[in-house]
Amino acid sequence: MNKIILTDSTNPQKEIIHHASTILSNGGLVIIPTETVYGVACDPNNNKAIKRLQKTKGREKNKPISCLCSSIDQVKKMCINWNKSIELLCKKYWPGPLTLVLETDNGWIGFRLPKHKIPIELCNRFGDLLALSSANFSGGTDSISADQTSSLDVDLILDGGLSSDRPIPSTVIKIDKNKIERIREGCITFKEIEDYFYNGLQD
């Protein structure tokens, strides 16, 4: 198959998803669309793949990489401080452009359940979480089309068309017990999340 493959964003072709999943299983890098911007995905449990992703983007090694999930249960099993507030926040904003940084046995990890068929189907086919970082050189403008990512050294690009009208990433917040902290403001304002989180949702 070609490096750039047109992929139906509403009903992704099974053979393309299978091909992308195989590449990920072999330690490769695959660029995929989300409902916000395009991202570079790899196997989060493959250290060589993570290092290659960092090198490809020129990303600092100590900068954390978030993970995509295909269900709330995947995250619930990993989070060691899961509570009712986190669950209600997930149910309100997922799937959607919100990344939650939660504590796990492996440290603090960002999780996101995207509102886009391609990453969801790929996660399901891969059978695990996917490490994902924005498909651009570190510090550069986020990409909203496959063409904008073509200079990155990856194994496959799934072209699902324009991901959004503007290159605005997901909002990132950290939840520590019953407190939230803004890491990055994106599609959803921190004030909206803060108001919802503290509006009678605590255990």
Residue ranges, per PLM feature:
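Active-site-adjacent structural elements in enzyme catalytic cores
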Residues: 1-203
